[in-house]
């Protein structure tokens, strides 16, 4: 898939940010996956799960959906290079009460520009069980 094809796909499937969809640039996931609370991937996953579930698109510019790609080359889990499967496992490990059912990371790498985009599909929290990240239940206030 070319970068243009991927951008068209993203625009058709995830046309705008809303309560169920967030776009994040995160050019380098090494310090962004489980990093500063509130600004890292696990905090966003918690917040989206605690609404109705949805999608986190990583590797695109906020507001424009321009593909910038994300670098996972220095991201490791337990000393092993990260991939979509190990990142999914890490999410369930770091996000208390996050259901693995419906949780999925879809990975796209453009053929022409070699840019990587991850789409994290996030299930809704279980009844009376908010999803925690950094021992807190996150919520998307601006989307209420």
Report residues per predicted region.
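Conserved N-terminal catalytic/coupling substructures associated with nucleotide/phosphate chemistry
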Residues: 1-144
């Amino acid at each position: 898939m070319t970068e243009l094809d991927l951008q068209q796909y993203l625009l058709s499937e995830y046309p705008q940010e809303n309560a169920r969809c967030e776009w994040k640039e995160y050019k380098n996931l090494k310090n962004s996956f489980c990093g500063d609370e509130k600004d890292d991937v696990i905090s966003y996953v918690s917040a989206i799960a605690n609404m109705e579930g949805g999608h986190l698109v990583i590797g695109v510019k906020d507001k424009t959906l321009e593909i910038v790609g994300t670098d996972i080359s220095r991201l490791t889990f337990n000393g092993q290079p990260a991939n979509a499967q190990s990142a999914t496992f890490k999410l369930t490990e770091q996000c208390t009460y996050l259901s693995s059912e419906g949780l999925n990371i879809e990975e796209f790498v453009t053929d022409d520009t070699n840019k990587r985009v991850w789409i994290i599909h996030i299930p809704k929290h279980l009844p009376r069980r908010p999803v925690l990240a950094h021992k807190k239940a996150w919520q998307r206030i601006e989307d209420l």
